[in-house]
């Protein structure tokens, strides 16, 4: 994945009844309100979309050490949205948030180290930050960490560990992870070969538009036995009547 990501606001953060109340709190210096206000301007929610205004409020919150705002600000510098693109500034703000434990920032910082944007390319550092993020439940980081284990780059090749992280991400509906998990079941790498389980995960990924899964699913359905097993696997996952 080569697109920087940010998370939605955490459930334990403040909320305001109206946009005006949030803006008033932001103007009074409330960092969380400033961060929310930045998101509103970025997405055009409650106000006309204005990326420069979004960056202004993200910066105010980031300078008060709000980790979510730091992550958003870092991504703005990474993508050049509302500010001139500057990878060094992106790395600076993402590191600030990552060191506070923000999983989206940790993932994005790992991406910078993997690609060598704003920091010297360093796969070991990339894996370090992907692991930190993955352990906090961030699915994109779980997927990237799984890929490192599957390929044996930087870390010892470990198909079982790859399956573990693919599964964690797949259960959070990440299509690429669902597809790769299906491939693991198809080939028996890191898990016992299971054509029905492979088809099950290919179906889940294919429904989200994953082209590789759609192709592999077509190949599997050429086998009547695999198709019948897949139907049984799908039935197991279906909600049961009371």
Tell what function each PLM region has.
Residues 36-43, 72-79, 108-115, 144-151, ...:
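Hydrophobic face of amphipathic alpha-helices that form TPR/SEL1-like repeat modules
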Residues 2-43:
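N-terminal segments that cap or nucleate solenoid repeat domains
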Residues 35, 64, 71, 100, ...:
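Cationic, low-complexity basic patches in intrinsically disordered or flexible, solvent-exposed regions
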Residues 27-30, 43-45, 50, 64-66, ...:
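Short helix-capping/linker turns of helical repeat alpha-solenoids
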Residues 10-17, 214-242:
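Terminal, low-structured helical/coil segments at or just beyond the last alpha-helical repeat
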